[in-house]
Amino acid sequence: HLSLRRQRQMCIRDSNEGAFVSTILFSLSCPPDIPLWQAAMGISFGLVIGKEIFGGTGKNFLNPALTGRAFLYFAYPAQISGDKVWIAGISDYNLIPEGYSGATALGVAAESGMAGITNAYTWMDAFLGNIPGSVGETSIIAILIGLAVLLITKVASYRIVLGTFVGMILMSSILNIVGSETNPMFAIPWYWHAVIGSFAFGLVFMATEPVSGSGTNTGRWLYGIVIGVTVILIRVINPAFPEGMMLAILFANLLAPVIDHMVIMSNIKKRKALYNE
């Protein structure tokens, strides 16, 4: 009886902690002026459809916070995106502070390319967080502090972090070389991609989520590379969506079981070959 009671208490505590983390990450990924009823609907969808329906804590194959964010993006695109991307209807009531009344760096890049970004912001502005954006994505310094904590406590895998960064650098460099006369996003270098939009925030706090990511060491490298390549492809080639980290991570979530299966089968074949020798 005591054993069952302890197990039940542990399950309740784990479930509550998981829901708390998902709720915080969801809130940080939203625009600051999102209506509270939309925020409640989004996180409810993420927790119920993206997590509990598959068995709860430890059994979800999609990131719950991003699932809720994606639901809002497709259900209410006018409120959650637009010309100003993360900053929407609050401007109708003249409540936006002057320093945050412009389009985001990615929105500027989609319209004017590197010339537009450098005219509006400096790289240091983007690094320090002095640019428009969602609640949690703007300050790279704060995100790096979070990354250090996650790596030291071994909650996050450095393989996913490095794999995503390598994939992003590789894909953005290829597109820089290819170039485009009609799409200014082709010219954005990797070091700008790293500090604008939700790349850093998504990489540190969403992509490294252990449940929905790959579980094998080799698979984590591949999982990260898939995210890095996909986010650049979405940002650069899809003119309707200048961001891309959310969809890139969800796409990689779907591929994670396949990646792990391929890695495990490859390891089995190698061991069989060694055994037969």
Predicted regions: what they are:
Residues 13-22, 39-44, 59-69, 158-166, ...:
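Cytoplasmic-side transmembrane-helix entry/capping segments in multi-pass membrane proteins
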Residues 18-19, 24-95:
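Membrane-interface helix-loop-helix junctions at boundaries between adjacent transmembrane segments
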Residues 62-144:
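Long hydrophobic alpha-helical segments that form multi-pass transmembrane helix bundles
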Residues 18-27, 41-42, 46, 50, ...:
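Alpha-helical transmembrane segments in multi-pass membrane proteins
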Residues 237-277:
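Cytosolic-side transmembrane-helix boundaries in multi-pass membrane proteins
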Residues 61, 65, 190-199, 220, ...:
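Loop-to-transmembrane alpha-helix initiation sites
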Residues 1-12:
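Single conserved hydrophobic/aromatic residue that forms the stacking wall/gate
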Residues 33-42, 130-140, 186-199:
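Structural signature of hydrophobic alpha-helical transmembrane segments
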